[in-house]
């Protein structure tokens, strides 16, 4: 005899044996997909209104369905809704309770749709909302970088390649570089949003439906500018989730790189920056410690987001057409990535607002390590010496300085001219870090005029631009 609980399952008609309890627990997703309730209800209300409009159900039934769904949403939001361990997923939990509340009319809600297109809709509605929120968090972080750049417009520090001192740069230039990365991240997310913002509902299980549904009407109700074109692709497509996870991975990579610099710069060996006590922790045994745990955790959580991307891609790579239950496993990586990215963007914006830079130490380090050696080579080029020859001359001068324990600016004119007779007294101006920075006036360079122009364009909304700009 058929188990009574099996009769309550919407798909239980052809089954003669009850579902094994282990299978019930193993296949249930209600513990994590319940966060989709708002979007499931929003989609169901739009679907019910379409069914009424198309005269597939009557107005009285449609009204009861819509009001019942609104009551369920209120109960979930107030915490009075009871999820059952037997609920497979958020769709079944809501439908079962709707039928309990309004009777047979509730059983008509699923007319003309499948959980396959229903869940695709829920995820798209969810991700559409979350991308908008992430973009707002990115806007705040970009604003924090901009304000800090304006504040540090004259601060000079050593720029690094291979983590070795390379050339002096403005701190503002460095900070705007991170903002530039976030601009690209924002562009990718907005592009991803376009592919998320497509209505899947109406694809049904995989082949569409024979019922006279109106997908365009549902799209208008849910503010989707586009409707999916192939029902088989629609129910199997999770490209948009993978694309979001990839865009999120790049966001996290950029945040991680910045945090790596902060971790190094806040060490006693660098002493370039002090992170506020509010964003650091101490040691349980070493009283002197002030650890950059927030920055370290952002760096660590980046690997977590990468893992979510790889998990989804691995999940998708072997799926036959069309829908497969494997796709249930797309949600936890997605939800975790959304939560992680939002948390990291939010806390990093607050942390950088409260950082203090050691300007004196930065300049002191910029003046060492032969950071103006390239300026000397370019000086020789301006004197008519081919660059490769100039490069060799300066390399020998640097070796001589290391041997003599001097900086380039400390060499006498006699010492300079021993290596190259065209060098004269005007070389000393070229070797100051201030003049070095000032001379980097090519478009996008670190000269103050270029950096301030970039700030101006950002503030006036004219950045970035594809127009060719005259270099000043």
UniProtKB/Swiss-Prot annotation:
Main location per the UniProt record: cytoplasm
Signal sequence, renumbered to the chain: none
Pfam family name, one: Lyase_1
Gene Ontology annotations of biological process type: arginine biosynthetic process via ornithine; L-arginine biosynthetic process
Gene3D superfamilies: Fumarase/aspartase (C-terminal domain), Fumarase/aspartase (Central domain), Fumarase/aspartase (N-terminal domain)
Organism domain of life: Bacteria
Pathway membership: Amino-acid biosynthesis; L-arginine biosynthesis; L-arginine from L-ornithine and carbamoyl phosphate: step 3/3
UniProt entry keywords in alphabetical sequence: Amino-acid biosynthesis, Arginine biosynthesis, Cytoplasm, Lyase
GO cellular component: cytosol
Entry's localization field: Cytoplasm
GO molecular function: argininosuccinate lyase activity
Reactions that this protein is recorded to catalyse: 2-(N(omega)-L-arginino)succinate = fumarate + L-arginine
EC nos: 4.3.2.1
InterPro entries in UniProt: Arg_succ_lyase_C, Argininosuccinate_lyase, Fumarase/histidase_N, Fumarate_lyase_CS, Fumarate_lyase_fam, Fumarate_lyase_N, L-Aspartase-like
Family: Belongs to the lyase 1 family. Argininosuccinate lyase subfamily.
NCBIfam families linked: argH
Protein name: Argininosuccinate lyase
Organism: Syntrophus aciditrophicus (strain SB)
């Amino acid at each position: 005899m058929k188990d009574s609980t099996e009769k309550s399952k919407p798909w239980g008609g052809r089954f003669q044996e009850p579902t094994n309890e282990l299978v019930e627990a193993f296949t249930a997703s209600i513990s994590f997909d319940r966060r989709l309730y708002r979007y499931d209800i929003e989609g169901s209300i739009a679907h019910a209104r379409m069914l009424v409009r198309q005269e597939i159900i009557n107005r009285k039934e449609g009204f009861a369905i819509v009001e019942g769904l609104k009551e369920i949403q209120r109960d979930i939001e107030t915490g009075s809704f009871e999820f059952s361990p037997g609920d497979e997923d958020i769709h079944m939990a809501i439908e079962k309770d709707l039928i309990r509340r309004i009777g047979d009319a509730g059983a008509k809600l699923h007319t003309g749709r499948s959980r396959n297109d229903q869940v695709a809709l829920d995820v798209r509605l969810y991700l559409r909302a979350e991308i908008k929120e992430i973009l707002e968090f990115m806007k705040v972080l970009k604003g924090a970088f901009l304000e800090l750049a304006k504040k540090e417009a004259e601060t000079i520090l050593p720029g690094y390649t291979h983590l070795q001192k390379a050339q002096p740069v403005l701190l503002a230039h460095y900070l705007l570089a991170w903002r530039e990365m976030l601009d690209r991240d924002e562009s990718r997310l907005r592009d991803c949003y376009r592919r998320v913002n497509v209505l899947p509902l109406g694809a049904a299980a995989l082949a569409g439906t024979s019922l006279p549904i109106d997908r365009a009407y549902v799209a208008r109700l849910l503010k989707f500018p586009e409707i999916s074109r192939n029902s088989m692709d629609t129910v199997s497509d999770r490209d948009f989730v993978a694309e979001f996870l990839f865009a999120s991975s790049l966001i996290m990579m950029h945040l991680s790189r910045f945090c790596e610099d902060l971790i190094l710069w806040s060490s006693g060996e660098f002493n370039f920056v002090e992170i506020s006590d509010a964003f650091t922790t101490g040691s349980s045994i070493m009283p002197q410690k002030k650890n950059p745990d927030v920055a370290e955790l952002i760096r660590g959580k980046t690997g977590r987001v990468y893992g979510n991307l790889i998990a989804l891609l691995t999940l998708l790579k072997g799926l036959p057409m069309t829908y497969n239950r494997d796709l249930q496993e797309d949600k936890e990586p997605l939800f975790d990535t959304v939560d992680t990215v939002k948390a990291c963007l939010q806390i990093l914006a607050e942390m950088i607002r409260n950082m203090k830079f050691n300007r004196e130490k930065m300049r002191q380090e910029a003046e060492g390590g032969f950071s103006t050696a390239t300026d000397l080579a370019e000086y020789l080029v301006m004197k008519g010496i081919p660059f490769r020859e100039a490069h060799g001359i300066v390399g020998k001068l640097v070796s001589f300085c290391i041997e003599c324990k001097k900086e380039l600016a400390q060499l006498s004119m006699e010492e300079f001219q021993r290596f190259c007779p065209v060098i004269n007294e005007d070389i000393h101006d070229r070797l100051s870090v201030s003049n070095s920075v000032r001379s980097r006036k090519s478009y996008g360079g670190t000269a103050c005029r270029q950096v301030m122009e970039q700030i101006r364009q950002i503030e006036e909304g004219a950045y970035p631009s594809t127009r060719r700009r005259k270099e000043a």
